[in-house]
From Swiss-Prot:
<keyword id="KW-0012">Acyltransferase</keyword>
<dbReference type="GO" id="GO:0005886">
    <property type="term" value="C:plasma membrane"/>
</dbReference>
<dbReference type="Pfam" id="PF19277">
    <property type="entry name" value="GPAT_C"/>
</dbReference>
<dbReference type="GO" id="GO:0016024">
    <property type="term" value="P:CDP-diacylglycerol biosynthetic process"/>
</dbReference>
<dbReference type="Pfam" id="PF01553">
    <property type="entry name" value="Acyltransferase"/>
</dbReference>
<protein>
    <recommendedName>
        <fullName>Glycerol-3-phosphate acyltransferase</fullName>
        <ecNumber>2.3.1.15</ecNumber>
    </recommendedName>
</protein>
<keyword id="KW-0594">Phospholipid biosynthesis</keyword>
<dbReference type="InterPro" id="IPR002123">
    <property type="entry name" value="Plipid/glycerol_acylTrfase"/>
</dbReference>
<dbReference type="GO" id="GO:0006631">
    <property type="term" value="P:fatty acid metabolic process"/>
</dbReference>
<dbReference type="InterPro" id="IPR041728">
    <property type="entry name" value="GPAT/DHAPAT_LPLAT"/>
</dbReference>
<dbReference type="InterPro" id="IPR022284">
    <property type="entry name" value="GPAT/DHAPAT"/>
</dbReference>
<dbReference type="GO" id="GO:0004366">
    <property type="term" value="F:glycerol-3-phosphate O-acyltransferase activity"/>
</dbReference>
<dbReference type="InterPro" id="IPR045520">
    <property type="entry name" value="GPAT/DHAPAT_C"/>
</dbReference>
<feature type="short sequence motif" description="HXXXXD motif">
    <location>
        <begin position="308"/>
        <end position="313"/>
    </location>
</feature>
<keyword id="KW-1208">Phospholipid metabolism</keyword>
<dbReference type="InterPro" id="IPR028354">
    <property type="entry name" value="GPAT_PlsB"/>
</dbReference>
<keyword id="KW-0443">Lipid metabolism</keyword>
Length: 807
């Protein structure tokens, strides 16, 4: 390797500085990988390349890592900082031997034998000039630009054409101390290290570029030859009394309507546009858990992303983040309503495939779509779909639509060999640009059809949207899920492939709910969501600034000291910082008087802010319920609190997709924190510290509307034990409207008929609609709910339930 200060390298670095823009994966190697700044470090690269090492040098300087040009000096032994598996490839002739690099491995291993305390980190580094995966009918451009082992001339062309799309990826370090102790220090282990590294680099390239792209028409012909589609075409011809040729043409039309037409060139252009867009809209995108997903890709999993659906921005945000995290943007299942010009063709070339809202018993369409999905899985493309089926208008997760999840499980049952893993993804925003439209729709306004004019209208409203949040939840590998749900599933399917297993539908429902629960497990508690939660629980939606900051400090402490799950993320900074962020985004108003500043939510903004509160209300619903128990009782035992929480938790779990694994432990941890923070005192029983009552009342306020709903339901059930589910749903909704009108409840979900349906289904499952005479459970929960309400609200509910027009 030429010396760092040689004229040749200086010239090369100057050229690259002006032609090359490098993206680092992961963005912070020290935070995301196992790198240790206190230990010596060497880099491993696949191929010796002056331009690659020059690009690496630029990045290591910025990251505070050792320069690849600095030799590694250990115990008097001088070795290159970069170890390459292959020598340079000349324009003509054979590649240079890799023996010098194997000898370097040997020297490093030998030093470990001499110096027992030494532990050099070997860090694999992959460089990519562009990320074109290539096509099955590859073009000359791909041949020139996208070879894995380019000559110096081809590398020059790659830098010229693809220098703005250079990616440098660091991987977890390998301990040479471990290798030396476990496997020895001879030439054999050096060769083994080289082989393992080659496999690693090959897998990394597959993760970064994705599988080879098919020719779209060739893909159609391949799908039409499949046995299941041929059979579906024959059945279509017979049932519609048309020729097989006509049925085949219909199938081709369906394929053309459905199939993506992924274009790497468009993705590169979109990356530039989206970088501009995110920088204009957001002050930052916060990401948690990407490394575990990158590892799943590396291990050969077929990845299916299942995000929550807040906004049309979701399609763009997740793909953009995955691209910058060194993974290929997925093929996205988009509603056919988004297939309008010009967005539809652009989405299609960005990887979207389109799905009808309903298949309406169309067997041919179903067969075509299923076969296309199978093909995506078989070829190794990652897939994304929204299991809610549409965007949430209230900020809460919607009940899942199980169609796509069922199709994914069916693909596994039909014999996908690779592990198929669902990745729940929580997407959050400090500002959702459609939120005002959502509340118009909830108030009865008809939903507007998507069009290019809506796009232009949205662009006009672009402004400071704060921050975005992408949290990857705990993955679910479907083969493992099936082993847990139906241990003999492989045998059953092999014995009768055409027979639908009896356990399949219940399993799909369980899986869908598990996905939604794990999305909520990965929630992001941000400045906007936390501040909305506090202010909406206060009288008049307003608080003194110092009290608001103190309450936020309590909530931050609660989330950090008693974490909801390890996948949840919590805003940085203290309460003062969070309030300032919210004010800068103009989400809250501030006024001053001689006694201090007051932060409030404007009356016309209150409904809007419930959307953001609802994103994270599940994180605080149990602490809020505990606070309600404490503030409504002068003294209460831990056992009594746990009993109340146990009674309400099944409904909370169904309504809010909660997944607390050890509820008694969680309740006790929350109580212990309250005691430690001086909010509660404990002798034989628990009681609120008088000076801290206001904080506990604020926390208790977050569960009040939920308890009002439960009080409505259980008062109705206790008063009319034999009422039907449909009656309970309609009368609960009617009573909720009355309660809202009398007590000023504006949260849209309070009047959501679907929510009362969800609760009635859960009540039936829990046995509250049974014919047994003993209704003591219903009466107990009714009394508990009533005891936790304000007297005026309780009186309205009890009086309304016993009123003549309800019964």
């Amino acid at each position: 390797m030429p010396k760092q200060d040689s004229l040749w390298l200086k010239s090369l670095r100057w050229i690259q500085k002006h032609l090359v823009h490098t993206i680092v994966v992961p963005q912070d190697p020290f935070a995301d990988l196992n790198l240790d700044a206190s230990r010596p470090l060497a880099y491993v690269m696949k191929t010796e390349s002056l331009s690659d090492i020059a690009a690496l040098s630029e990045i290591t300087t910025k990251l505070g890592l050792p320069s690849p040009y600095e030799p590694l000096v250990v115990n008097g032994v001088v070795a290159p900082r970069v170890v390459c598996l292959e020598g340079r490839k000349p324009l003509f002739g054979e590649r240079a031997s890799n023996e010098p690099f194997l000898e370097c491995f040997m020297r490093l291993l030998a030093v470990h034998k001499e110096k027992p305390e030494l532990d050099i980190q070997l860090v694999p580094v992959s460089l990519y000039w562009g990320r074109t995966p290539g096509k099955e009918d590859d073009t000359m451009k791909a041949a020139v630009l996208e070879r894995e082992n380019p000559t110096w001339l081809r590398k020059c062309l790659m830098i010229l054409f693809l220098g703005r799309h250079n990616f440098v990826q660091f991987s977890n370090a390998v301990s040479l101390r471990y290798m030396a102790d476990e496997h020895g220090t001879d030439m054999g282990i050096a060769h083994k290290l080289a082989r393992v590294a080659r496999v690693h680099f090959r897998r990394q390239r597959k993760v970064m570029t994705g599988p080879v792209l098919p020719n779209r028409q060739a893909l159609f012909h391949s799908l039409l030859k499949s046995e299941s589609l041929r059979k579906a075409i024959q059945e279509e011809a017979a049932s519609k009394k048309i020729s097989e040729t006509q049925a085949r043409e219909t199938a081709i039309e369906y394929l053309d309507e459905i199939a993506a037409n992924y274009s790497d060139s468009l993705v590169r252009i979109a990356e530039r546009f989206l970088t501009w867009l995110w920088n204009k809209l957001y002050s930052g995108i916060n990401i948690k858990g990407a490394e575990q997903i990158r590892q799943l890709h590396h291990d050969g999993h077929e990845i299916v992303y299942v995000p929550c659906h807040r906004s049309h921005m979701d399609y763009l945000l997740l793909s953009y983040i995955l691209y910058y995290q060194g993974m290929v943007p997925p093929h996205i299942a988009a509603g056919i309503n988004l297939n309008f010009w010009p967005a539809g063709p652009l989405f299609r070339r960005g990887g979207a495939f389109f799905i009808r809202r309903s298949f309406n018993g169309n067997k041919l369409y179903t067969a075509v779509f299923r076969e296309y999905l199978d093909q995506l899985f078989a070829k190794g493309y990652s897939v994304e779909y929204f299991s809610e089926g549409g965007r949430s208008r209230t900020g809460r997760l919607l009940a899942p639509k199980t169609g796509m999840i069922a199709m994914t499980i069916n693909s596994v049952l039909r014999g996908i060999e690779r592990p198929v893993t669902l990745v729940p993804v929580y997407l959050g925003y400090d500002h959702v640009m459609e939120v005002a439209t959502y509340h118009k729709e909830l108030s009865g306004k008809k939903k507007q059809k998507e069009s290019v004019w809506q796009v232009f209208g949205a662009i006009r409203k672009l402004g400071n949207f704060g921050q975005g949040y992408v949290n990857f939840g705990e993955p679910i590998t479907l083969q493992n899920f099936l082993n847990e749900t139906a241990p003999n599933w492989r045998t059953e399917v092999a014995d009768d492939p055409e027979q639908k297993p009896t356990w399949l539908t219940p399993a799909v429902n369980v899986l869908a709910n598990r996905v939604m629960t794990r999305i909520n497990d990965a929630a992001a508690a941000s400045s906007i969501t936390l501040t909305s939660l506090v202010l909406l629980a206060s009288e008049q939606n307003a608080l003194e600034r110092c009290l608001l900051e103190r309450q936020l400090d309590l909530y931050l402490t609660l989330l950090k000291r008693v974490p909801y799950t390890s996948f949840t993320s919590v805003a940085e900074g203290d309460g003062k910082h969070l309030v300032q962020q919210g004010l800068e985004l103009n989400k809250f108003s501030i006024s001053a008087d001689p006694l201090g500043e007051i932060v409030s939510i404007d009356a016309n903004q209150a409904i809007t802010m419930t959307y953001y509160r609802n994103n994270i209300i599940h994180l605080f619903i149990i602490p809020s319920l505990i606070a309600s128990c404490l503030t409504n009782n002068k003294q209460i035992s831990r056992a009594s609190i746990l009993g109340i929480v146990n009674d309400f938790y099944p409904l909370l779990k169904a309504e809010l997709f909660m997944g607390i694994k050890d509820l008694p432990s969680y309740v006790n941890q929350v109580l212990d924190l309250f005691i430690e923070q001086g909010l509660v005192q404990e002798s034989d029983t628990l009681s609120v510290v008088t000076e801290r009552t206001s904080q506990m009342l604020l926390l208790a306020g977050s569960v009040s509307e939920t308890l009002q709903r439960y009080a409505i339901i259980f008062n109705l059930l206790a008063h009319r034990p034999k009422m039907e589910r449909s009656e309970l749903e309609s009368e609960s909704h009617l009573l909720a409207q009355r309660l809202g009108a009398l007590h000023g409840i504006t949260a849209p979900e309070f009047y959501d008929k679907k929510l009362y349906n969800t609760l009635s289904v859960k009540l039936k499952e829990l046995g509250y609609f049974s014919e047994k005479e003993d209704k003591s459970d219903v009466e107990r929960i009714r009394d508990q709910a009533n005891s936790l309400l304000r007297a005026s609200v309780r009186q309205t509910i009890v009086a309304s339930v016993t009123a003549e027009h309800i019964v």
